[in-house]
UniProtKB/Swiss-Prot annotation:
UniProt GO molecular function: beta-amyrin 28-monooxygenase activity; heme binding; iron ion binding; oxidoreductase activity, acting on paired donors, with incorporation or reduction of molecular oxygen, reduced flavin or flavoprotein as one donor, and incorporation of one atom of oxygen
Required cofactor(s): heme
Major location category of this protein: membrane
Gene3D superfamilies membership: Cytochrome P450
InterPro entries documented for this protein: Cyt_P450, Cyt_P450_CS, Cyt_P450_E_grp-I, Cyt_P450_sf
Name the record gives this protein: Beta-amyrin 28-monooxygenase
Superkingdom to which the source organism belongs: Eukaryota
Record's catalysed reaction(s): beta-amyrin + 3 reduced [NADPH--hemoprotein reductase] + 3 O2 = oleanolate + 3 oxidized [NADPH--hemoprotein reductase] + 4 H2O + 4 H(+)
Signal sequence, renumbered to the chain: none
Coiled-coil portions: none
Length: 475
């Protein structure tokens, strides 16, 4: 009896493994697929993909396989990521193909871990999603954002006065996140209470850590903690939405005061849960990009004093023309040419969005290789930005790369591209420049550990030690 049970158990395990192996291999049975390797059944090469990021070198997963499987630096190779066969498109030509074929041959796609952390109804990613995105893009247009520069300036000044002044040493990354999250809450939700903002930020941080984790929902795992935090966060954002609906009905809030009011007055009967999912997404994107860029700008300005001096000189000239207590304006931002070149070079070396996925909605060929319908596609900003064909001596920090006409089209993609390009890129530009202005006019700084440059991508890039610095006020 015991041997029979053991035999049945072992047989079921073997049959399951054979099924998984057969299913895994069936994805790659087409003719003329891109070169590459598929890794292990089910997990594919996901662990290698995640590991390279957590070691601060996300481009290595791509560049190693480009050298091994592709004759040039632009092309396509196959792999298997997050449970799906995946084609990785490389170089400016790959980026252009994906970005210009959005909603024709490819659509946006997220791994299952993201979908479980951010559950959505069918309408969230179809008609309502498109409508919400259009509304957000209207809010994020440069002409619409101009009136918010003074608010950004006010929030930045208060942040540096309360959390940096009188400090001798601090850790940059968490403070950068706190600042940019405060700006996002103020402009998107009209939320200005520091205690309430801090509580919401803690929820967001707990959610983000599990986005690209292994999707095993067991107690104690990062994925499980992220799912729990996501539920609590969604509940809080739904409460904010419900409160705003009442304020709009009672005339205590206006349709023009922030993104939330603008959406509520424009989308009709959209469910609060769907609105909450969308708001959570734009709040993550609305502060993480600027927080990451600001952190690494501070890092590189500490490493290159001559660049810091040139940025300081540019910002001093702007400050000199301002009256006391006068806020920054659009005309001031337009004068920050070199400061923006510095920010662009920082985002080349450390792109806030290291890459992203698409899904093939039809069969197509690229560079002579067949890509089946249903395959996932990945583009890499880090690999493109470190390609010497586009950026000579790519590891060298050189802001002057962005003088004149700048890089080749589709070779510089910190905000993605095509219809799915980050709608908040102009918002991020204004916020980054406002922060630089307030920062360099107040402080000089140095790194506590000058030779420590470890970067961890999990899922977004950040300094391994948070970037501790010593600060020295100008006055």
């Amino acid at each position: 009896m015991y041997l029979t049970i053991l035999f049945l158990f072992v047989s079921s395990i073997l049959l399951s493994l054979m099924f998984l192996l057969r299913k895994h291999l069936s994805h790659f049975s087409y003719q003329n697929l891109p070169p590459g390797k598929t890794g292990f059944p089910l997990i594919g090469e996901s662990l290698s993909f995640l590991s390279e990021g957590r070691q601060g070198r996300p481009e290595k997963f791509v560049t190693d396989r480009v050298r091994r499987f592709i004759s040039s630096s632009t092309g396509v190779f196959k792999t298997h990521l997050f449970g799906y066969p995946t084609a990785v498109m490389t170089g400016a030509s790959g980026n252009k193909f994906l970005f210009t074929n959005e909603n024709k041959l490819v659509v946006s796609w997220w791994p299952d871990s993201v979908k479980k952390i951010f559950p959505y109804t069918q309408s969230t990613y179809t008609d309502e999603s498109k409508k919400l995105r259009i509304l957000l893009m209207q809010f994020m247009k440069p002409e619409a954002l101009r009136k918010y520069i003074g608010v950004m300036d006010e929030v930045a000044q208060r942040h540096f006065e309360t959390l940096w002044t009188n400090q001798k040493q601090l850790i940059v990354y968490p403070l950068s996140k706190k600042l940019t999250f405060s700006v996002a809450c103020r402009l998107f939700l009209s939320m200005d209470d520091p205690e309430r903002v801090s509580k919401l930020e803690d929820r967001f941080n707990s959610v983000v850590t599990g986005i690209y984790s292994v999707p095993i929902d067991l107690p104690g795992t990062r994925f499980n903690r992220s799912i729990k935090a996501s539920r609590l966060l969604r509940k809080e954002v739904c409460a904010i939405i419900g409160q705003r609906r009442e304020e709009l009905k009672a005339g205590r809030a206006s349709a023009e005061q922030d993104v939330l009011s603008h959406m509520l007055m424009s989308v009709g009967e959209t469910k609060d849960e769907d609105l909450a999912n969308y708001l959570i997404g734009i709040l993550i994107g609305g502060h993480d990009t600027a927080a990451i860029a600001t952190t690494f700008i501070i890092n590189y300005l500490a490493e290159y004093p001559h660049v810091y001096q040139r940025v300081l000189q540019e910002q001093k000239e702007i400050l000199k023309e301002k009256k006391e207590e006068e806020r920054l304006k659009w005309e001031d931002i337009e004068k920050m040419k070199y400061s923006w070149n510095v920010a662009c070079e920082v985002m080349r070396l450390v792109p806030p969005l290291t890459g992203n996925f698409r899904e093939a909605i039809d069969h197509f060929t690229f560079k002579g290789f067949y890509i089946p319908k249903g395959w996932k596609l990945y583009w890499s900003a880090t690999a493109t930005h470190m390609n010497p064909d586009y950026f000579p001596e790519p590891e060298r920090f050189e802001p002057n790369r962005f003088e004149g006409s700048g890089p080749k089209p589709y070779s510089y993609i910190p905000f993605g591209g095509g219809p799915r390009m980050c709608p908040g890129r102009e918002f991020a530009r204004l916020e980054i420049l406002v922060i630089i202005h307030n920062l360099v006019n107040r402080f000089k700084w140095e790194k506590v550990f000058p030779n420590e440059n470890k970067i961890v991508v999990d899922p977004l890039p950040k300094p391994g030690n948070g970037l501790p610095i010593r600060i020295f006020p100008h006055f």
